[in-house]
């Protein structure tokens, strides 16, 4: 049975719960609910849950270090479990993808995303799988305020469909691997 560490990026605390920057946390919470894997154990500078789902062993991790230091948490988990970086799946928000769309990528730069920057620094490589959840760019105004603000009411209405779609993608990714999942889901509108 393969083991995958799935890290959702976000900021801890109720203040950030519904912000665009917490898309990774939201997906992980939905996956946790559907898979019956409680994310409650305080470890690896985060909260973690482990269990079997759809024939795969999953370790679900939500760093509690705030976005800019997320890499420390993921690196602790990878080292403890002695897993290669190829078994790491990171779910994060992406400004360059319209809301409701998702893209997959193996490796690459951080594109200004501080959580990805921290991961690459702490792991010594950016060669992990990324599930990029589109949040779109602000039409006007500051990007920082945009990502740290809650989704709009219209977006909130579509969020359950988006989260369920990303969970389906993650399930396929853990079971079938990146190439097959990319061919089905890359740049797909999930809402």
UniProtKB/Swiss-Prot annotation:
* PROSITE patterns (UniProt xref): PEPT_TRNA_HYDROL_1 (PS01195), PEPT_TRNA_HYDROL_2 (PS01196)
Q: Where is this site: Stabilizes the basic form of H active site to accept a proton?
A: 93
Annotated binding of tRNA, by residue: 16, 66, 68, 114
Question: Where does it localize?
Answer: Cytoplasm
**Which SUPFAM superfamilies does the entry link to?**
Peptidyl-tRNA hydrolase-like
Q: What does the annotation say about its assembly with partners?
A: Monomer.
UniProt lists the family membership as follows: Belongs to the PTH family.
**What is the protein name given in its UniProt record?**
Peptidyl-tRNA hydrolase
Q: Which organism is it from?
A: Geotalea daltonii (strain DSM 22248 / JCM 15807 / FRC-32)
């Amino acid at each position: 049975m393969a083991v995958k560490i799935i890290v959702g990026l976000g900021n801890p605390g109720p203040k950030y719960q519904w912000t665009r920057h917490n898309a990774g946390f939201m997906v992980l919470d939905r996956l946790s609910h559907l898979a019956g894997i409680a994310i409650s154990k305080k470890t690896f500078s985060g909260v973690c849950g482990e269990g079997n789902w759809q024939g795969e062993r999953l370790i679900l991790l939500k760093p509690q270090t705030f976005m800019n230091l997320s890499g420390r948490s993921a690196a602790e988990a990878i080292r403890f479990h002695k897993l290669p970086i190829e078994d790491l799946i990171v779910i994060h928000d992406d400004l360059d993808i319209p809301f409701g769309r998702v893209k997959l990528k193996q490796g690459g730069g951080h594109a200004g995303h501080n959580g990805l920057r921290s991961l690459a620094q702490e792991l010594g490589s950016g060669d992990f799988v990324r599930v990029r959840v589109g949040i779109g760019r602000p039409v006007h105004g500051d990007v920082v305020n945009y990502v740290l603000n809650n989704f709009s009411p219209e977006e909130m209405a579509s969020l359950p469909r988006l989260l369920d779609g990303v969970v389906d993608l993650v399930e396929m990714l853990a079971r079938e691997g990146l190439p097959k999942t990319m061919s089905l889901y890359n740049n797909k509108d999930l809402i």
